[in-house]
Amino acid sequence: MPERNHLLVVCSPKSLVLLVVLSPELLLLGTSLQLQDNAYEGLLVAIHPRVTEDQDLIPKITGMITEASSYLFNATKRRVYFGHVKILIPDTWKTHNYSQPKWENYEKANIIIADWYRKHRDDPYTLQYRGCGEEGQYIHFTPNFLLNDNLTAIYGSRGRVFVHEWAHLRWGVFDEYNNEKPFYMAGHNQVKVTRCSSDLTGIFVCEKNTCTQENCIIHNLFKEGCMFIHNNTQNATASIMYMQSLSSVVEFCNSSTHNQEAPNLQNQMCSLRSTWDVIMDSVDLRKSIPLDAAALPPPPTFSLLQTGDRIICLVLDVSGKMAEADRLLRLHQAAEFYLLQVVEIHTYVGIVSFSSKGLVRTLPRQIKNPRDRKQLSSTLPTTVIAGVGANICSGLRTGLQVIESLHGNAFGSVIILATSGGDGDISNCLSTMINSGSTIHTIALGPFVAENLEELSILTGGLKFFASDKSSSNGLIDAFSRISSGTGDIFRQPVQLDSAGEIIDIHQHFNRTVTIDEGLGNDTVFLVTWETHGPPDIVLQDPSGKKYFTEDFNTNPELKSSYLWIPETAKTGHWTCLLNNTHSSPQALKVSVSSRASDDVVPPVTVTAHVDKDETHFPHPVIIYADVKQGFYPILQANVIAVIEPEIGEPVRLELFDDGAGADIIKNDGIYSRYFFSFTVNGRYSLKVHVHQESHIRRLSKSIPRSHAIYVPGYIVNGNIQMNAPKKSTGDGDIQVQKWGFNRTTSGGSFSVLDVPTGPHLDLFPPCRIINLEAIRKEEEIILSWTASGEDFDQGQAASYEIRISKNLQKITDDFKNAILVNSSKMIPQPAGSRETFVFTPALLTKEQQQQLDGEMGEADKIYLAIRALDETSLQGQVSNIVQAALFIPGIAPSVPAREFLILKGVLTAVGLIMTLCLMIFVAHCTFSRKKKSRKKDNRTKLL
């Protein structure tokens, strides 16, 4: 595994700036979803445009949420329920009397209805990759899950499943089952089922042929093929995060019913806290007062929305500051690329320029063919109005007028605002823009843009970008490439493959190799831009060896750009692009490549990137996320590099990991993460991500995302086993081997940093929290293992570890520093990201510590352990997840009966009863016979 401390480097001026396209699913829950007077208002459900039209789907959705509202109300002790819900119908369905959406689109939905591709599967799940108590991204249901009533036997009623997933999404709790560890060893060598609560009953049965001829009774080792089947009738009322399908389960596990022993993700991520404790700590429930006993919540209300014409207006700054650093030229290059390549067909586009006031350059024009695209690009502004400032509100109001000229309102429209200044008057038009129903994407050019510019994006659900003045940066093109239609249909959207720039010396070359992988190749375009003079010498070679030269490109000398569209479908494989600076001085040369899907069934690989917050204050870090997937399947073993660029100074390159450590919550889920804290100046920072994977790598995970409803294999009904259909195998057929590999580039938007000190400062960055501590009992030893944290968060190498134990869970949870310290002084921490192992034995404790441990209140047969890392300045990381281990193993039979054991016990009991009855009859018969013979003897005596 790579050592993380070697992966943080500062780019030189000649370093390549590699960027990646942010996909829709990683937008956080919007401000539209709010809790008002105990009711969740503004929940958005969106149907993917590729879902086949079926009018039965809508009542299934409304029925599910109506049932969920009542179940949620009771599960939260009369605190919350669902109020108004919006259902967004795709434009691929027939038009009915639906309402027109405002800001709502598929990308912003809390609940998405979409098919998987390849193997048909219907597991409901929540995309959740942040910490305990933090919101997830979205809930995913398939159409078949909603339409096929047979699946309720497997997952439970849809309303109950919805509440299970809602707890993931809204409150950041985790599952209480564990498919990888369905059983665990408790004290006294007892085998227990990973469940919550532990009061749920059932039996062990054989799942596979390997144990059909023998009893599935488990002692020291688990037998392969054993599984646990629950009784369908239970007395236990918890827990919804374990098996909501059981009719008796109506609440979350609380502090009295929670199973802290179970090796599940809830215990690992939330430090053994119950789901109800985490939920009660949420903002929602802290401010919610239970309704009176006599009060009942009203049923949810629903509105149906359908997107109509897509309308976009470019609002472009031409004030005096746009003359600096070639800002207007670079903006023109990026806007033209957007119009010619990115914006989807049938979209209406208008263009406005502004300085002290707005100017209409073109009213909305629908794109029907390439001629419309060229006509629109010809109206882009080319000159700056010198000596005049930028009145952003004037430009925005003019943009609204252009949009409203088409249909009378701005509902569902998009404004792309690009500016290098601003006079601070944004507050004067903020409410107007919010109420307009238009989504505003903002692009800040250079270091002197109004500080509150991003409020326009945040409050209207738009994206925000920052483009530096570095001549080798492609930030503007990357920002425009990221802005999609919001429909979620990746088949209709361009995919950015590469974007890079470098300052090239005289007669030197700039080389790029771009891979066009399977599934792409339609509408492929290579864009070359330069800084000064004429175009460089261009040589582009396709995988078959065919070459394209400068004269094959469509060149605009004034715009300093050259395009080449590849006819039909571009060849799959490696394309090489060589740019030769033939001019008399160094200049910045840049290249961008994008393509569209060539396959209408298999989706292309996509990448999404963002940070966990819009703004941070030094020394608090941000977390960078990149979601790499094909359809909904995670891509593994990719090389993911984030490029973070400040307003002033050199960019920083940082490798992201999917290893389940540090900032990364779950291993192998396709979410690559890392802490970033190398702040050099105050202001805006841009995020760009580059993803690359070599050819012939097994890269597509066959697993579904975590945080999904459990697939119930069957139940015990009236003493009989009733099995559900076995879960469909995903097998290796879902794991794709790419002949050529792939590469992607995307923009992750921007974030702001405040309170960065000038000059040298003290080390304020502690090691990150260890989140994957594990304990395994092996004879008299307890083997601890975890992923190493770093000197600073998840980077570098920690100085030491502090391991403590206690028999009392409360003590190690609330008073870690006073728990018993284990001697780990001989252990030298490894670089961040490495696998650590430590063997604990009683010999490591002093006599006094052993006496202290023996005297602690708690169970005699188990101890709790936790760890934290320290750096060279003794800064302490947070305490890890808490694990437990058995102290001794007397060997007692399992606490849960096995199916065959129960059958054998019943047979033996019956045989015993029969034998006892036979013995009683025999004894009675013998006694009666003896008495009868005695009477006959007496009679004979008397006769004599």
Where are these regions (language model features)?
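The catalytic-center signature of Zn2+-dependent metalloproteases
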Residues: Y155-E251
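Exposed acidic/Ser/Thr-rich ligand/metal-binding surfaces
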Residues: G308-D489
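Conserved aromatic anchor
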Residues: E780-G796
